[in-house]
Amino acid sequence: MPIGGDVKADQETSGSRSIKRIGFGFIGGIGYDITPNITLDLGYRYNDWGRLENVRFKTHEASFGVRYRF
């Protein structure tokens, strides 16, 4: 089961005001072999990109996949 994370920081200057932002994310997933050649994948990703002014930017992503190996 893969699990990961990431942290990003950014700084902007707007006029005489400095803006600092930090974001982070987490991912996780699992694969299940239903036959020797076919795997079902299920994954989730969360990102929090921080706040800009009074708005918070977050994303949630779920994924489902089928892999075929030859």
Curated annotation (Swiss-Prot):
One of its GO terms (molecular function) is porin activity. One of its GO terms (cellular component) is cell outer membrane. Pfam families: Opacity (PF02462). SUPFAM superfamilies: OMPA-like (SSF56925). Signal peptide: none annotated. Belongs to the opacity porin family. This is Uncharacterized protein HI_0414.
